Amino acid sequence: MMTSWSDRLQNAADVPANMDKHALKKYRREAYHRVFVNRSLAMEKIKCFGFDMDYTLAVYKSPEYESLGFELTVERLVSIGYPQELLNFAYDSTFPTRGLVFDTLYGNLLKVDAYGNLLVCAHGFNFIRGPETREQYPNKFIQRDDTERFYILNTLFNLPETYLLACLVDFFTNCPRYTSCDTGFKDGDLFMSYRSMFQDVRDAVDWVHYKGSLKEKTVENLEKYVVKDGKLPLLLSRMKEVGKVFLATNSDYKYTDKIMTYLFDFPHGPKPGSSHRPWQSYFDLILVDARKPLFFGEGTVLRQVDTKTGKLKIGTYTGPLQHGIVYSGGSSDTICDLLGAKGKDILYIGDHIFGDILKSKKRQGWRTFLVIPELAQELHVWTDKSSLFEELQSLDIFLAELYKHLDSSSNERPDISSIQRRIKKVTHDMDMCYGMMGSLFRSGSRQTLFASQVMRYADLYAASFINLLYYPFSYLFRAAHVLMPHESTVEHTHVDINEMESPLATRNRTSVDFKDTDYKRHQLTRSISEIKPPNLFPLAPQEITHCHDEDDDEEEEEEE
């Protein structure tokens, strides 16, 4: 006879003794199937599942798709007057990573932390460090809010652009035909600033995406450029059984239809043996031309799409939600109205940390799931190169040993130079395992700007949303404790504290002598017996009053 969890938890004192770290690990899914949690989320509270298309439902193959975008953008630049020699460049996926910042003044690609501190600085293909960096960034720091100067390359679509900017800066800096300047380059009497060059690249990228042949070439060879996953119909059909499913993409209907038709092009339906279904049947609401992030604010006029021609019907759509209708434009408020849902009822799944995740979280309160395809490689390095991480920990222990018996009275200065050199070498080797710009999430022990944005705005994240297939829809995604240094480096063992040295350490904040408190209160009230006094002493809460998790609101449960 099996014992229920509620029975097993009656004696809660037994749980910690039996549930050590190794025991916890056996309940976790495989790393490549995991969904990672920043803020707790109860799946049973989710009533609507929303999807972006590009790089979410439709994952583009890397580096094939980035190479195509790179080539088309270079061709566009050459067509408007840039040197023919640029056509010799080919996309190198080992150089760029997402989340880099381009300095339009000096032409540098920067990797920074959440506060704007420099982690990596590259001028073209030349990595700058030390005194050279301080000439342009005296405090090794940038003002991230100076958006006129600093542009964050945060999306997967930015990867070809990131590498192209490095190619251009390196070419114009080193080509003998041009004279390199601090803020640009000269060709005779002609001066081109890095700001102007950057704007040309931005315009070329937009042209390739909206007027060029990128989408046409993608559709011509879908097998080459788009990942097709047989588990997609199964997951969406299961989602539709427990809630509503919608698609909100910035792409137009014609392109969306071709991509989605390919993604669901299987001889069977959700399961082998079931009949094939058109892709539209997996969604309760389909919305194209969303124009995110504007979509999460005032939005645009809601129109209806003629699915036979791909053109928009005249007039604003004002009717109820109808199955089979494809909408264009609108806003996140429109989605909520049509689906009869409110902010926290919706889990929105996308890859764009600004256009999908940040805006849906800040403006609408939607729950958020960030798709980070690079996470697969990050996890591979984290596990496959564990020896490097372990060596860093050993070096930290060795460093601590050298100082173990020294205090402020010591004149001895241990020689730690060799340890420092080794730490730098191991950290560099670790960084290079990810690529030339290092990890998407860190540089050594310091987290990147991108990592901080993921932690701040994404409730859940994973390499693919398909990982939701491995969790029940009743699952409670619980966030792990985010430990501060004094918590992560101090063991849970009793430490005798000298009260004279640390008087606040033994200050009693948990237990109160209520008899003594009542006596004092009685003494006070006797002296002012004719006045009913206010509460003179706070009482410790006897019920749970603190909010510990994002998704543990008992008031909402009581209302339901």
Swiss-Prot record:
Record-linked InterPro entries: HAD-like_sf, HAD-SF_hydro_IG_5-nucl, HAD_sf, Pur_nucleotidase
Region spans: Disordered: 541-560
Superkingdom of source: Eukaryota
UniProt keyword annotation of Transmembrane present: no
Residue sites binding IMP per the record: D52, D54, R202, D206, K215, T249, N250, S251, K292
Alphabetically ordered keywords of this record: Allosteric enzyme, ATP-binding, Cytoplasm, Hydrolase, Magnesium, Metal-binding, Nucleotide metabolism, Nucleotide-binding, Phosphoprotein, Transferase
Positions bound to Mg(2+): D52, D54, D351
pH dependence: Optimum pH is 6.5.
Feature: compositional bias, Acidic residues: 550-560
Activity regulation description: Allosterically activated by various compounds including ATP, 2,3-BPG/2,3-Bisphosphoglyceric acid and Ap4A/P1,P4-bis(5'-adenosyl) tetraphosphate. Binding of an allosteric activator is a prerequisiste to magnesium and substrate binding. Inhibited by inorganic phosphate.
Compartments it resides in: Cytoplasm, Cytosol
Matching SUPFAM superfamilies: HAD-like
Signal peptide: none
GO cellular component terms given for this protein: cytoplasm; cytosol
Pfam family, one: 5_nucleotid
Phosphoserine, modified sites: S418, S502, S511, S527
EC number: 3.1.3.5, 3.1.3.99, 2.7.1.77
Listed CDD domains: HAD_cN-II
Residues that, per the record, bind ATP: R144, N154, Q453, R456
Cofactor note: Binds 1 Mg(2+) ion per subunit.
MF terms (GO), sorted A to Z: 5'-nucleotidase activity; ATP binding; GMP 5'-nucleotidase activity; identical protein binding; IMP 5'-nucleotidase activity; metal ion binding; nucleoside phosphotransferase activity; ubiquitin protein ligase activity
Self-association state and partner proteins as the record states: Homotetramer.
Family annotation (NCBIfam families): HAD-IG-Ncltidse
Record family assignment: Belongs to the 5'(3')-deoxyribonucleotidase family.
Role noted for this protein: Broad specificity cytosolic 5'-nucleotidase that catalyzes the dephosphorylation of 6-hydroxypurine nucleoside 5'-monophosphates. In addition, possesses a phosphotransferase activity by which it can transfer a phosphate from a donor nucleoside monophosphate to an acceptor nucleoside, preferably inosine, deoxyinosine and guanosine. Has the highest activities for IMP and GMP followed by dIMP, dGMP and XMP. Could also catalyze the transfer of phosphates from pyrimidine monophosphates but with lower efficiency.
Protein name: Cytosolic purine 5'-nucleotidase
Species assigned in the record: Rattus norvegicus
Taxonomic lineage of the native organism: Eukaryota, Metazoa, Chordata, Craniata, Vertebrata
